[in-house]
Amino acid sequence: MISLLQKTKILSNTPSRAIIQIDGVYPGYGITLGNALRRVLLSSLEGAAVTSFRVAGVAHEFSVVPGMYEDVIQLSLNLKRLRFKVFSEEVEKIRVAAKGAKKITAADLDKNAQVEVITPDYPIATLTDPKASLELELTIERGIGYILAEKRKRKEKLPIGTIELDANFSPVTRVNISVENMMVGERTDYNRIKLEIDTDGSLDPVEAFHQSLGILMEQFQALRGDVDSPKVKEQESTFAVLEKREDIKAIPVSEAKISARTVNVLTKHRIKILGDLD
Protein backbone atom coordinates (compact mmCIF):
# COMPACT_ATOMS: atom_id res chain seq x y z
CA MET A 1 0.00 0.00 0.00
CA ILE A 2 1.31 3.46 -0.91
CA SER A 3 1.57 5.54 2.28
CA LEU A 4 0.35 9.13 2.53
CA LEU A 5 2.57 12.15 3.02
CA GLN A 6 3.50 13.47 6.43
CA LYS A 7 2.56 16.97 7.61
CA THR A 8 4.00 19.88 5.59
CA LYS A 9 6.51 22.07 7.43
CA ILE A 10 7.01 25.81 6.84
CA LEU A 11 10.74 26.29 7.48
CA SER A 12 10.68 30.05 6.78
CA ASN A 13 8.16 32.58 5.53
CA THR A 14 8.44 36.25 4.53
CA PRO A 15 6.09 38.37 2.38
CA SER A 16 8.04 37.36 -0.72
CA ARG A 17 9.91 34.13 0.10
CA ALA A 18 9.14 30.82 1.79
CA ILE A 19 10.83 27.46 2.23
CA ILE A 20 8.41 24.54 2.54
CA GLN A 21 9.35 20.97 3.42
CA ILE A 22 7.26 17.89 2.63
CA ASP A 23 8.33 14.71 4.45
CA GLY A 24 7.48 11.05 4.02
CA VAL A 25 6.97 11.13 0.27
CA TYR A 26 6.66 7.63 -1.19
CA PRO A 27 9.90 6.50 -2.91
CA GLY A 28 10.20 7.97 -6.40
CA TYR A 29 7.32 10.41 -5.96
CA GLY A 30 9.51 13.34 -4.91
CA ILE A 31 10.46 14.54 -8.40
CA THR A 32 6.96 13.83 -9.74
CA LEU A 33 5.16 15.88 -7.09
CA GLY A 34 7.85 18.57 -6.91
CA ASN A 35 7.85 19.24 -10.66
CA ALA A 36 4.05 19.32 -10.81
CA LEU A 37 3.90 21.90 -8.01
CA ARG A 38 6.67 23.97 -9.60
CA ARG A 39 4.92 24.14 -12.98
CA VAL A 40 1.61 25.18 -11.44
CA LEU A 41 3.25 27.77 -9.18
CA LEU A 42 5.04 29.43 -12.10
CA SER A 43 2.27 29.32 -14.68
CA SER A 44 -1.18 29.05 -13.17
CA LEU A 45 -1.65 31.57 -10.35
CA GLU A 46 -3.51 34.83 -10.82
CA GLY A 47 -1.74 38.18 -10.57
CA ALA A 48 -1.90 41.74 -11.90
CA ALA A 49 0.14 43.62 -14.50
CA VAL A 50 0.13 46.70 -16.73
CA THR A 51 -1.51 45.68 -20.01
CA SER A 52 -1.50 49.05 -21.81
CA PHE A 53 -0.65 52.72 -21.33
CA ARG A 54 -1.13 56.13 -22.88
CA VAL A 55 1.19 59.14 -22.88
CA ALA A 56 -0.22 62.58 -23.60
CA GLY A 57 0.98 63.75 -27.03
CA VAL A 58 2.32 60.31 -28.05
CA ALA A 59 0.72 58.38 -30.92
CA HIS A 60 2.85 55.20 -30.96
CA GLU A 61 5.74 53.40 -29.26
CA PHE A 62 8.38 54.85 -31.61
CA SER A 63 7.66 58.41 -30.54
CA VAL A 64 9.88 60.60 -28.36
CA VAL A 65 8.64 62.61 -25.38
CA PRO A 66 10.37 66.02 -25.25
CA GLY A 67 12.51 66.40 -22.14
CA MET A 68 12.29 62.70 -21.16
CA TYR A 69 15.54 60.74 -21.05
CA GLU A 70 13.93 57.39 -22.00
CA ASP A 71 12.25 56.74 -25.32
CA VAL A 72 8.78 55.21 -25.31
CA ILE A 73 10.13 51.68 -25.84
CA GLN A 74 12.30 51.95 -22.71
CA LEU A 75 9.32 53.46 -20.87
CA SER A 76 7.22 50.42 -21.81
CA LEU A 77 9.93 48.07 -20.49
CA ASN A 78 9.96 49.96 -17.19
CA LEU A 79 6.18 49.69 -16.92
CA LYS A 80 6.25 45.94 -17.52
CA ARG A 81 8.46 45.53 -14.44
CA LEU A 82 5.99 47.24 -12.10
CA ARG A 83 4.09 44.92 -9.76
CA PHE A 84 0.65 45.51 -8.27
CA LYS A 85 -1.94 43.89 -6.05
CA VAL A 86 -5.46 44.51 -7.35
CA PHE A 87 -8.42 43.98 -5.02
CA SER A 88 -11.21 44.18 -7.62
CA GLU A 89 -12.11 42.05 -10.62
CA GLU A 90 -12.47 45.13 -12.82
CA VAL A 91 -9.92 46.75 -15.12
CA GLU A 92 -8.25 49.56 -13.16
CA LYS A 93 -6.79 52.84 -14.40
CA ILE A 94 -4.00 54.64 -12.59
CA ARG A 95 -2.30 57.91 -13.58
CA VAL A 96 0.80 59.97 -12.96
CA ALA A 97 1.45 63.60 -13.89
CA ALA A 98 4.88 65.16 -13.36
CA LYS A 99 6.59 68.43 -14.25
CA GLY A 100 10.17 69.62 -14.07
CA ALA A 101 13.47 67.75 -13.93
CA LYS A 102 12.96 64.71 -11.71
CA LYS A 103 13.01 60.93 -11.51
CA ILE A 104 9.54 59.39 -11.62
CA THR A 105 9.01 56.12 -9.77
CA ALA A 106 6.00 53.91 -9.07
CA ALA A 107 5.56 55.77 -5.77
CA ASP A 108 4.48 58.84 -7.80
CA LEU A 109 1.44 57.07 -9.23
CA ASP A 110 -1.91 58.46 -8.10
CA LYS A 111 -3.57 56.62 -5.23
CA ASN A 112 -6.24 54.06 -6.09
CA ALA A 113 -8.23 52.27 -3.40
CA GLN A 114 -8.35 49.09 -5.51
CA VAL A 115 -4.65 49.01 -6.43
CA GLU A 116 -1.64 48.54 -4.16
CA VAL A 117 1.78 49.34 -5.63
CA ILE A 118 4.15 46.52 -4.61
CA THR A 119 7.28 48.04 -6.19
CA PRO A 120 7.20 51.76 -5.26
CA ASP A 121 10.94 52.23 -5.83
CA TYR A 122 10.92 50.94 -9.42
CA PRO A 123 11.74 53.68 -11.97
CA ILE A 124 9.22 54.77 -14.58
CA ALA A 125 10.94 57.66 -16.37
CA THR A 126 13.40 60.55 -15.93
CA LEU A 127 12.61 64.13 -16.91
CA THR A 128 15.81 66.04 -17.68
CA ASP A 129 14.40 69.45 -18.66
CA PRO A 130 12.95 71.83 -16.03
CA LYS A 131 10.19 72.66 -18.51
CA ALA A 132 9.40 69.03 -19.36
CA SER A 133 6.15 67.33 -18.35
CA LEU A 134 4.75 63.83 -18.49
CA GLU A 135 1.14 62.69 -18.30
CA LEU A 136 0.78 58.93 -18.19
CA GLU A 137 -2.23 56.62 -17.79
CA LEU A 138 -1.77 52.92 -17.02
CA THR A 139 -4.30 50.13 -17.48
CA ILE A 140 -3.91 47.35 -14.91
CA GLU A 141 -5.65 43.99 -15.23
CA ARG A 142 -5.75 40.64 -13.48
CA GLY A 143 -4.76 37.52 -15.37
CA ILE A 144 -2.90 34.20 -15.39
CA GLY A 145 0.47 33.39 -16.94
CA TYR A 146 2.22 35.36 -19.69
CA ILE A 147 -0.02 36.78 -22.40
CA LEU A 148 1.23 38.47 -25.56
CA ALA A 149 -0.45 41.74 -26.49
CA GLU A 150 -1.63 40.38 -29.85
CA LYS A 151 -3.23 37.34 -28.15
CA ARG A 152 -5.33 39.45 -25.80
CA LYS A 153 -8.96 39.66 -26.87
CA ARG A 154 -10.66 43.04 -26.52
CA LYS A 155 -14.41 43.59 -26.50
CA GLU A 156 -14.06 47.20 -27.62
CA LYS A 157 -11.60 49.38 -29.53
CA LEU A 158 -8.85 51.03 -27.55
CA PRO A 159 -8.48 54.84 -27.59
CA ILE A 160 -6.04 56.31 -30.11
CA GLY A 161 -2.52 56.45 -28.72
CA THR A 162 -2.96 53.37 -26.51
CA ILE A 163 0.15 51.19 -26.48
CA GLU A 164 -0.46 47.56 -25.52
CA LEU A 165 2.09 45.49 -23.60
CA ASP A 166 2.90 41.82 -23.26
CA ALA A 167 1.89 41.04 -19.67
CA ASN A 168 3.44 38.70 -17.13
CA PHE A 169 0.67 38.20 -14.57
CA SER A 170 2.37 35.49 -12.52
CA PRO A 171 3.02 36.60 -8.92
CA VAL A 172 5.59 33.81 -8.50
CA THR A 173 9.04 34.79 -9.74
CA ARG A 174 11.10 31.70 -8.88
CA VAL A 175 10.60 28.15 -7.61
CA ASN A 176 13.45 25.84 -6.69
CA ILE A 177 12.89 22.20 -5.72
CA SER A 178 15.27 19.72 -4.12
CA VAL A 179 14.61 16.06 -3.32
CA GLU A 180 16.57 13.95 -0.87
CA ASN A 181 16.12 10.54 0.76
CA MET A 182 14.91 10.14 4.34
CA MET A 183 14.11 7.31 6.73
CA VAL A 184 10.53 6.23 7.34
CA GLY A 185 10.24 3.20 9.62
CA GLU A 186 12.97 0.80 8.51
CA ARG A 187 13.16 2.15 4.95
CA THR A 188 15.69 4.78 3.92
CA ASP A 189 14.48 5.47 0.38
CA TYR A 190 11.49 7.70 1.13
CA ASN A 191 11.70 11.24 -0.29
CA ARG A 192 11.81 14.67 1.31
CA ILE A 193 10.84 17.64 -0.90
CA LYS A 194 12.05 21.18 -0.23
CA LEU A 195 10.35 24.00 -2.13
CA GLU A 196 11.83 27.49 -2.22
CA ILE A 197 9.15 29.89 -3.47
CA ASP A 198 9.82 33.53 -4.37
CA THR A 199 6.97 35.92 -5.21
CA ASP A 200 6.76 39.56 -6.24
CA GLY A 201 5.17 40.41 -2.88
CA SER A 202 1.60 40.61 -4.17
CA LEU A 203 0.90 37.05 -2.98
CA ASP A 204 2.13 35.35 0.17
CA PRO A 205 4.35 32.42 -0.92
CA VAL A 206 2.65 29.96 1.44
CA GLU A 207 -0.74 31.01 0.04
CA ALA A 208 0.73 30.48 -3.45
CA PHE A 209 1.67 26.94 -2.39
CA HIS A 210 -1.86 26.26 -1.13
CA GLN A 211 -3.42 27.66 -4.31
CA SER A 212 -1.22 25.43 -6.47
CA LEU A 213 -2.29 22.38 -4.43
CA GLY A 214 -5.92 23.34 -4.95
CA ILE A 215 -5.44 23.62 -8.71
CA LEU A 216 -3.81 20.19 -8.94
CA MET A 217 -6.49 18.60 -6.77
CA GLU A 218 -9.26 20.07 -8.92
CA GLN A 219 -7.62 18.74 -12.08
CA PHE A 220 -7.24 15.22 -10.67
CA GLN A 221 -10.77 15.31 -9.27
CA ALA A 222 -12.07 16.14 -12.74
CA LEU A 223 -10.13 13.18 -14.18
CA ARG A 224 -11.53 10.89 -11.54
CA GLY A 225 -15.05 11.50 -12.82
CA ASP A 226 -14.09 10.05 -16.22
CA VAL A 227 -12.42 6.90 -14.90
CA ASP A 228 -14.26 3.71 -13.85
CA SER A 229 -14.11 2.95 -10.16
CA PRO A 230 -11.15 0.66 -9.33
CA LYS A 231 -13.48 -1.47 -7.15
CA VAL A 232 -15.86 -2.04 -10.07
CA LYS A 233 -12.99 -3.01 -12.36
CA GLU A 234 -11.61 -5.37 -9.72
CA GLN A 235 -15.03 -6.97 -9.27
CA GLU A 236 -15.53 -7.39 -13.01
CA SER A 237 -12.07 -8.93 -13.32
CA THR A 238 -12.86 -11.41 -10.52
CA PHE A 239 -16.08 -12.49 -12.21
CA ALA A 240 -14.24 -13.01 -15.50
CA VAL A 241 -11.68 -15.26 -13.82
CA LEU A 242 -14.40 -17.29 -12.13
CA GLU A 243 -16.30 -17.74 -15.38
CA LYS A 244 -13.14 -18.86 -17.15
CA ARG A 245 -12.43 -21.29 -14.34
CA GLU A 246 -15.92 -22.84 -14.65
CA ASP A 247 -15.44 -23.26 -18.42
CA ILE A 248 -12.19 -25.12 -17.83
CA LYS A 249 -13.88 -27.49 -15.39
CA ALA A 250 -16.35 -28.55 -18.09
CA ILE A 251 -13.64 -29.71 -20.51
CA PRO A 252 -13.67 -33.51 -21.04
CA VAL A 253 -10.50 -35.28 -19.99
CA SER A 254 -10.17 -36.73 -23.48
CA GLU A 255 -10.01 -33.20 -24.96
CA ALA A 256 -7.59 -31.77 -22.41
CA LYS A 257 -4.02 -31.09 -23.46
CA ILE A 258 -2.53 -33.93 -21.45
CA SER A 259 -0.74 -37.14 -22.37
CA ALA A 260 -2.61 -40.30 -23.41
CA ARG A 261 -1.20 -42.15 -20.40
CA THR A 262 -2.66 -39.53 -18.04
CA VAL A 263 -6.03 -39.73 -19.83
CA ASN A 264 -6.07 -43.52 -19.34
CA VAL A 265 -5.26 -43.19 -15.64
CA LEU A 266 -8.00 -40.57 -15.10
CA THR A 267 -10.56 -42.60 -17.07
CA LYS A 268 -9.73 -45.69 -15.04
CA HIS A 269 -10.63 -43.70 -11.91
CA ARG A 270 -13.92 -42.60 -13.52
CA ILE A 271 -12.81 -38.95 -13.98
CA LYS A 272 -14.56 -37.78 -17.14
CA ILE A 273 -14.16 -33.97 -16.96
CA LEU A 274 -11.51 -31.74 -15.37
CA GLY A 275 -14.03 -30.58 -12.78
CA ASP A 276 -14.06 -34.10 -11.31
CA LEU A 277 -10.50 -33.47 -10.10
CA ASP A 278 -11.73 -31.00 -7.40
Segments (PLM) and residue ranges:
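Protein-protein interaction/assembly regions in multi-subunit complexes
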Residues: 1-273
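C-terminal tails and terminal domains of large nucleic-acid-associated
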Residues: 275-278
